[in-house]
Each structure stands twice: as C-alpha cells, then as structure tokens.
C-alpha cells in the first residue's frame, strides 16, 4: 500500500526508496510470530527467567530515575533537562515512552508465563506503583495519557489483574498529591503535565487574564478563551494546518510517506501555511496528509478490527490465559496507534519496530484465541 501511495503521489516530496524498504517491518512482525510458535512447540520451557531479567532492568531504571528526581542528576551524571526525568537515556527524554511501550509486553509475559498473580500480589503492587510513578515523574505527557487509557481498558476487560492495577493507580494518585503538597523533587511533573498543558490548550488566555465571574468582563474573557482554544498547543495547530494543506493537495494518496518532512525541507522549513517540522506529531493527521484517504481507510479499519476483536474475545470459549494475553496485547496495540493524542513519526524506525513487534505478538495471541 505504501508503494502504491508513493508512486501514485505524482508530485510527492518523498523519495521512493523510503517506501521500498518499509516491507521489512511486516516481515519482522511475521518473524516474531514464527519465533513464538517455534519456541512454544519445540524448545521453550516456560520459566520466568526472561521476566526476571526485564524486571531487574526496569527496577534499575526506577532507582536511577528517583535519584535524578530527588538529587537533580542520575548515577551517570545526567542532569534534569526541560523539567523532565530521563534516567540513563540522557538527552533523549524517552524514559516515559520506553516504559509505556514495555508495559503491555510485561503484562503479556505475566499471563503467558502463568505467573501466580495471587501469590505475588504484594510484589506486583509495589512494582506497578513504582512503574506508574516513574512514567509520571518523567514528565512525558503523551506517555502519561496513553498509560491511563491503556490501564482503563485493561481494568475494564482483564479481571485477573484488575485489583492490583487499581491499587497501584491509587498509590500513584497519592504520590501526585503528596508531591504537590510537599513540593519535593528537583522537577515539577505536575506543572508540566497538567498546568502547562492547560495553558497551551487555552493559549495562555486564562494565565493572562484574571477571571471574576461576577462582572461583565468575565463574559468577554470566556469568549476570548473559546476563540483561542488550541489542539494541544499553538505549534501542534501549526503542524496540523500544514498537514491539512498537504492533504487537500493530494487527498486520495497524500504527499507520500515522510512527505511532510520532505515538503518542509523543500521550503527550507519556512512554509507560508502552518508550521514546519519533521512530521505532523499525530498519527491520524500524518496518515491523512502522507497516505491520503487510502491510507486512512487501512488505519481506521485496523483500529476498528482491534476493537471488534477485543469485544468478541470475552465471549470465546478458550483458556483464560490465552484470552488475557490476547486482550493485553490487543489493547496495547490499539493504544499505541491511538489517534487523538500527539505522537511520534509513524514511519520512524524505532516506533515501527515497536508497533510491528506488537503486531507479531498480536498475531500469535490471535491464533491462540480465534483459531
């Protein structure tokens, strides 16, 4: 489909070779499926060594992140940047994103390896409480929002681990309240995630005006707020405006994969309409602008398929373990592709590896439940 879009977009700014090699990701997803099948049927002895290794690495990140949060720098000497905790990732600022993307895999492994949840209840509560807190203190707003959407859906559909996650979320809320009241730590994630986001969405209208609900000026200020409402921020609105222009130029096939970036390069990042960047910072907007209506049909159909299968899975007469595994990875894949939050570049190598890895695990779990 991407090849079709690239070559059909006659005036596309996208080098065709950027789409020629995208086929490696579907191959990667199928490879994950075959590897899981092979290990299950041939040599895989279900022990929890892999989970122990992952838990150890994650716990190290917890410790390092808290050291950076409390003292201002981590054990490697990396300091807090832009009010965000990054731990060993340094200037990359992807700690929250990394942890969020690992969360579905960890939960999937817990069910796949048949870990005794009741026996390890207290350990799991401590682990997931710290997990959610570290995503919060990382200051990554998108990861924090997606984590909450993911957890809401898991709590709704996966009964087995519902209580543990709810207790962990309660402890997260208590931590947020305590950190705001006591003001400890060298960064202020509450301000970044909640206050700054609100000010960006309202374009600082409330920040710049004192609202008195008892006078006539209040009505004018409220009207001004409505006029200045932004989708996430002024920059995001600028990206979406430019993406809308590219979509209108070629609505069927779009500007081609990575077309937003190459258009911005062609105008030296000084577009007459909107604001240039490397990508539109939203999956839905990017797919519409770069792959057009054709790409949108595939994207929307994929999300709809995931929702339908999540709902139908609950009625399948299969092992509870297999159903829980399928629900976890389905929700993880759906939330990773969620269209209503800021996002990275859909065609980015790291994100593509993550999404197609999820797809490979999804295909494996799908076979267990629906075949």
What are these regions (language model features)?
Residues 123, 127, 278, 282, ...:
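Loop-to-helix entry and N-terminal half of a specific, functionally important transmembrane alpha helix
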Residues 151-152, 302-305, 326-371:
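Transmembrane alpha-helices of multi-pass inner-membrane enzymes
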Residues 155-157, 161-165, 290-335:
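Hydrophobic transmembrane alpha-helices and their immediate junctions
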Residues 27-34, 46-80, 89-161, 166-181, ...:
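Alpha-helical transmembrane segments of multi-pass inner-membrane proteins
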Residues 219-291:
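Long extracytoplasmic/lumenal interhelical loops at the membrane interface
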